Amino acid sequence: GVGYPQQNLSHFRSTDIWASTADTYEEPTGWWGRYFEDLYPDYLINPPEIPPAVQIGNVGNLIFDGNNNNYAFTVANLEQLQNVAENGTLHDVVNIPDCVYGDKLLFMRATANTTFLYAETIHDAYTAASNNADYGEGDLGQQLSAVARLIKGGLGTKVYMVSLGSFDTHANQPERHQELLQDLSNSIKAFYEDLAVSGMDDKVLGMTISEFGRRPYENGSDGTDHGAASPVMLFGAGLNGSGFVGEHPDINEWDANDNLIPTNDFRDVYNSVLTNWFCLDPSVINTILLNQSYEILDLGIECQTLSTNDFSNVNRFSHVPVYKNNTVYLEMNVPSAGRGTIVLYDLVGREIGTIANQLFFEGRHSIDIKEAIGKRLSFGQYIYRISLGGQHYSKSLMIK
C-alpha cells in the first residue's frame, strides 16, 4: 500500500501532492519539473535539441512544471503535430514587463515556444518508426503505441506520461475495475512486445501512479469511495524478476477516517527509481525531492552509471557553484587545456556579463563570480553558461 501521512481525499489536491511531492504545503513545481530545471537552467535561451519530456493528455498535472517553465511537450494527440510545425511562430521571452502579468505571459510564451520548437522533431521521430504489436482500440493502447514509435524512432526523450481514467469507481466497481485492469494489462503487454522487436524492452521502465486508493469496504452503490494506500505497479524487462515489494496493508486495520494505512511512502518509490534507474547524483535527487530523505526500495533495478559531478575523476569535465562566506565560486575540473568562455544570464535570458574568456589549463579552477563580473549583482537566481571544447554546460546559481 503506497501513500503518505494524512491522505488528502480531494482529486485535485492529492494529484498535486503526488506531482509535487509536498504534502504539508502547496508547492507550485513538480518533481520532474525541478529535475529538468536543474538540468536545463538556461532552458529559455538554450533549449535542448529534444523535448525533456512528452505528455499525452492530462494537461493540468504540474508534474513537469518548474518555477518558470513547463518542461513537457504536451499534446492531446499526435495528429496535431504537423499543423503545429507548419503554422507555429516563436514568441519573445526577453521583453517582458516586470509584474504579475509579465510572469504569466512569460510562462505562456515559453510553453508555446517549446511546443513549436519540438513539433518537427517529434513528427520526424514518429514517422521514422512503426508499430509491431496489436494495441487494440483503447485510448491507453493508442497512447502507448505513439510512445513506442517515438522511442523506436530515436527521439531520445527519457520521460513520457500517458493516462488512463475512470478509476473513480463509486459505483459498479466489480465490472468497471476488471475492464480497466484488462485494458491496462493488454496495453502494457502490447507496448513491451513492440519495444522487444527493436531490442528496447529492457531499456524502458513503466510505472503507474494515482492520486489515491479506495476505501476497504463497499459504499452501498456497488463501489468504493476515495481512500488511501494505493498500489503502484512497475513494468519492464529491465526489472530483476517480479513480485510484491513491501508489506500489504492490514485489511482489518483502518485509520480514524476508515482508510487503510499505507506501508510505503510514494516518495520512497520515486527515490528508488531516480537512484537505481535514472542513476542521478544524490545532490540532484535531494533537489527533486525538496531536500527530504526517503528510503530506497528493492525494486529489482540497480544503477551502473557513475555520477556526472564526480570531482575525483580528473578525466571528466565537472562544474558546480560553491558558496563560501557570502561569496559564490564556480569550481571546474578541466581534463584538457582549451580556450573557453563563461557568461552569466538572468532567468529570462538577458546577458549580465562575461565571467571568463580565457585559456583554461588542465586541472581545477575556482572563479569568484562577483569579482569576475566586476559590477553589482542583485540578489537572486542566475544562470551561467560554459562554452569549452565545442561543448556547452549550464547551471543555475544564487547571488546572496
Identify what each model region corresponds to.
Residues 345-352, 382:
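Short, glycine-anchored, charge-dense loop/turn motifs used at functional sites
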Residues 331-336, 346, 386-388:
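Non-cytosolic beta-sheet module surface loops
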Residues 188, 194-220:
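Metal-dependent active-site segment of extracytoplasmic phospho-/sulfohydrolases and closely related
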Residues 301-325, 333-335:
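Residue-level detector of functionally pivotal "anchor" positions at catalytic/ligand-binding pockets or at interdomain
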Residues 354, 359-362, 370, 375-400:
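C-terminal tail/sorting-segment detector
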Residues 1-187, 193-197, 217, 231-238, ...:
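Feature for exported/extracytoplasmic and membrane-associated proteins, marking the mature portion
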Residues 338-341:
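Short beta-strand/loop motifs in extracellular/secreted proteins, especially
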Residues 227:
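Phosphate-handling catalytic cores of nucleic-acid transaction enzymes
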